[in-house]
Structures are given as C-alpha cells and as structure tokens.
C-alpha cells in the first residue's frame, strides 16, 4: 500500500534542536501565510529599478560610454 509506513521512528525523534535553530525559529513562524494586498511588491519594484540603473551605469563605465577623469578600463592599468 502506498500510504503505509515501514519504520517505527517517531516524528519527534528525527530532529535535533540546536541553539541556532531556536534562534531562527521566529523567522519561520509565518510560514505559509500570505499578506493581503500587494504588500511590499512596490518596494521590491523600486529596488529592482534602482539595481537596473546601477547595472547600466557600470556597463557604460566599462564600455567607456561615460568618460571619467583618471578612470581607465584596461588590463595594463590594473597591473601598475
């Protein structure tokens, strides 16, 4: 039968309680619950947009699209 069990181990005997697990237990107390509404979705979108702007700035510096004084992007300058 697919629902039968083969071991005599109790569920409570399978885990070990550690100080770290006890410390982190409150973080898992809301498991499975979903906040109503949009929650922090807008905040996440703002941070994603800021991160995208950051990546574009880094790409432009790397491609020398943005000229900065005393900033060179070459392997020779890194070896000095």
UniProtKB/Swiss-Prot annotation:
Membrane-spanning intervals of the chain: 42-62
Example GO molecular function: phosphate ion binding
Keyword terms: Chloroplast, Membrane, Phosphoprotein, Photosynthesis, Photosystem II, Plastid, Thylakoid, Transmembrane, Transmembrane helix
GO biological processes: photosynthesis; protein stabilization
Residues that bear Phosphothreonine: 6
Cellular localization per UniProt: Plastid, Chloroplast thylakoid membrane
InterPro entries: PSII_PsbH, PSII_PsbH_sf
One Pfam short name: PsbH
Gene Ontology CC: chloroplast thylakoid membrane; photosystem II
Changes after translation: Phosphorylation is a light-dependent reaction catalyzed by a membrane-bound kinase; phosphorylation occurs on Thr residue(s) in the N-terminus of the protein.
Bilayer topology: Single-pass membrane protein
Main location: plastid
Similarity-based family: Belongs to the PsbH family.
Quaternary assembly: PSII is composed of 1 copy each of membrane proteins PsbA, PsbB, PsbC, PsbD, PsbE, PsbF, PsbH, PsbI, PsbJ, PsbK, PsbL, PsbM, PsbT, PsbX, PsbY, PsbZ, Psb30/Ycf12, at least 3 peripheral proteins of the oxygen-evolving complex and a large number of cofactors. It forms dimeric complexes.
Protein role: One of the components of the core complex of photosystem II (PSII), required for its stability and/or assembly. PSII is a light-driven water:plastoquinone oxidoreductase that uses light energy to abstract electrons from H(2)O, generating O(2) and a proton gradient subsequently used for ATP formation. It consists of a core antenna complex that captures photons, and an electron transfer chain that converts photonic excitation into a charge separation.
HAMAP family, sorted: PSII_PsbH
Protein name: Photosystem II reaction center protein H
Lineage of source species: Eukaryota, Viridiplantae, Chlorophyta, core chlorophytes, Trebouxiophyceae
